[in-house]
């Protein structure tokens, strides 16, 4: 590791700790030349599959785009940022678990719909209306009826 102060390569770790529920390692380092101390954070870099769009174009997975779309559906809904981040982490895990280098955008959309259905039914309907391009009120009603007909989805808020 290069020292950010004098750019030498000779640094040593003087302390290490797990952070972020064990998903990162925080290391305290000291330069052997200038003796300055600095902190580094290490995390595993996981390769995400690319997304096959409806027009067959390939696009790199974009976590910010996923987060933005889910936030828009969850706008003004009583869902914590932690719950959203957990859902995003689960969706990314599902994508990696496919083992495929490329996944269709429809699969990603289904994972998002499943996650939103668990988080907040209103957000689920909002997302579904855009994702499935609802044309009229009838389609909203049909989707709401599906939610009401599935007793495993009923939760007390």
UniProtKB/Swiss-Prot annotation:
PROSITE patterns: ATP_CONE. The keyword Phosphoprotein does not apply. Disulfide bonds: none annotated. Its cofactor is Zn(2+). Keywords: ATP-binding, DNA-binding, Metal-binding, Nucleotide-binding, Repressor, Transcription, Transcription regulation, Zinc, Zinc-finger. A zinc finger (unnamed) spans 3-34. GO terms for molecular function: ATP binding; DNA binding; zinc ion binding. Pfam families: ATP-cone (PF03477), Zn_ribbon_NrdR (PF22811). InterPro entries: ATP-cone_dom (IPR005144), NrdR-like_N (IPR055173), RNR_NrdR-like (IPR003796). GO terms for biological process: negative regulation of DNA-templated transcription. Binds 1 zinc ion. Residues 49-139 form the ATP-cone domain. The keyword Plastid does not apply. Negatively regulates transcription of bacterial ribonucleotide reductase nrd genes and operons by binding to NrdR-boxes. HAMAP family: NrdR. Belongs to the NrdR family. This is Transcriptional repressor NrdR. The lineage of its organism: Bacteria, Pseudomonadati, Pseudomonadota, Gammaproteobacteria, Enterobacterales. The gene is nrdR.
